[in-house]
Swiss-Prot record:
PROSITE patterns: XPG_1, XPG_2. This is Flap endonuclease 1. Its EC number is 3.1.-.-. Mg(2+) 2 binds at D179, D181, D233. Phosphorylated. Phosphorylation upon DNA damage induces relocalization to the nuclear plasma. It is an enzyme of class 3 (hydrolase). Residues 328-380 are annotated as: Disordered. GO terms for cellular component: mitochondrion; nucleolus; nucleoplasm; nucleus. SUPFAM superfamilies: 5' to 3' exonuclease, C-terminal subdomain (SSF47807), PIN domain-like (SSF88723). It comes from Branchiostoma floridae (Florida lancelet). Structure-specific nuclease with 5'-flap endonuclease and 5'-3' exonuclease activities involved in DNA replication and repair. During DNA replication, cleaves the 5'-overhanging flap structure that is generated by displacement synthesis when DNA polymerase encounters the 5'-end of a downstream Okazaki fragment. It enters the flap from the 5'-end and then tracks to cleave the flap base, leaving a nick for ligation. Also involved in the long patch base excision repair (LP-BER) pathway, by cleaving within the apurinic/apyrimidinic (AP) site-terminated flap. Interacts with PCNA. Three molecules of FEN1 bind to one PCNA trimer with each molecule binding to one PCNA monomer. PCNA stimulates the nuclease activity without altering cleavage specificity. The gene is FEN1.
């Protein structure tokens, strides 16, 4: 799920914290990519006639095709990707995982009805809702990455937290994922849409953490509390408090503890035994492998191994796999030239021209910051 409504909130309140970029501008950059999120995208997007790709044996291959060609696209543009795989989920995520299981059950029932009614569009929609990344998908992608010469990391817990750790400690330039909670984990730079297909023509969105805090006028602790109020994977949020109210409350009262002292809990019911403090600790002190203990090594692809696995075992065209291997090898030696700015000190918050909201526009940052002092207070 990530953080509910955070991307829109940033667009409304901190537009200068994000800029759009082209993939070619990341030449020479190392990027830690959330593997599970990418594989999920591939399983949903890489399809034929609305169905997941399979080989002659009926095995799903959408994830392998997506991983192979999207990774080649990145490497071809000089990017050095490292994929980070999820470990065991934290105990606090059990509630969110249970909700996802319930939603899949509902989608399965809806799919059966749509199939009976012959509603093709609904069938396609509910099929996608049933998609789940399995251990087998992960294992097959790890094998493929090894043959491609691309490193991967097994996170002890959440992949987003591990990506943030690698970025914060300078092991990579940025964390690449669609889950906004990588910002809550404190990554200095986040990239969205990096693994999207070229055909979608979606620009890469680059978010800067330091600039985000500055434009929101929040500390790291206040930003984490804001994300918990918006809704995260680790606990429920307060019903009735959306993004607009959440940021106003955090700006006014500075912490969830103070907010709880002042809001009308009849109007805004607080979840029973709300473990917001445990969620906060999880974001501040996630279980990760320290960046200095992670070794990243990019090597030449194993062309023979790729042909054996992808063509002979999985049914992909041998010529296409060989062409892909050549692209990987050529691009790897080109990208070793590196970036000019790698020889100089890199500033944590690049100079980005701030996108000022239109003059007099509703919801400008200055207007959002002003509020009635007793707006959310308990009735006397």
């Amino acid at each position: 799920m990530g953080i509910q409504g955070l991307a829109k909130l940033i667009g409304d309140h901190a537009p200068g914290a994000m800029k759009e970029n082209e993939i070619k501008n990341y030449f020479g950059r190392k990027v830690a990519i959330d593997a599970s999120m990418s594989i999920y995208q591939f399983l949903i997007a890489v399809r034929q006639d609305g169905n997941m790709l399979t080989n002659d044996a009926g095995e799903a291959t959408s994830h392998l095709m997506g991983m192979f060609y999207r990774t080649i696209r990145m490497v071809d543009n000089g990017i050095k990707p490292v994929y980070v795989f999820d470990g065991k989920p934290p105990n606090m995520k059990s509630g969110e995982l249970a909700k996802r299981a319930e939603r899949r059950e509902e989608a399965q029932k809806a799919l059966e009805k749509a199939e009976e009614a012959g509603e093709a569009e609904d069938v396609n929609k509910f099929q996608k809702r049933l998609v789940k990344v399995t251990k087998e998908h992960n294992a097959e992608c790890k094998k493929l990455l090894t043959l491609m010469g691309i490193p991967y990391v097994d996170a002890p817990c959440e992949a987003e937290a591990q990506c943030a750790e690698l970025a914060k400690k300078g092991k990579v330039y940025a964390a690449g994922t669609e889950d906004m909670d990588v910002l809550t984990f404190g990554t200095n730079i986040m990239l969205r849409h990096l693994t999207f297909s070229e055909a979608r023509k979606m620009p890469i969105k680059e978010y800067y953490y330091d600039r985000l805090l500055a434009e929101l006028d929040l500390t790291q602790d206040q930003f984490i509390d804001l994300c918990i109020l918006l809704g995260c994977d680790y606990c429920d949020s307060i019903r009735g408090i959306g993004p607009k109210r959440a940021i106003e409350l955090i700006r006014q009262y500075k912490s969830i503890e103070e907010i709880l002292k002042h809001i009308d809990t009849k109007k805004f019911p607080v979840p029973e035994d709300w473990p917001y403090d445990q969620a906060r600790k999880l974001f501040k002190e996630p279980e990760v492998t320290p960046a200095d203990q992670v070794e990243l090594k990019w090597v030449d692809p194993d062309e023979e191994g790729l042909v054996q696995y992808m063509s002979n075992e999985k049914g992909f065209s041998e010529d296409r796999i060989k062409n892909g291997a050549k692209k990987l090898k050529n691009a790897r030696h080109t990208s070793t030239q590196g970036r000019l700015d790698s020889f100089f000190k890199v500033m944590s918050s690049p100079s980005v021209k701030r996108k000022e909201p239109p003059k007099g526009a509703k919801g400008s940052a200055s207007k959002k910051a002003k509020m009635s002092g007793g707006k959310f207070k308990k009735p006397k």
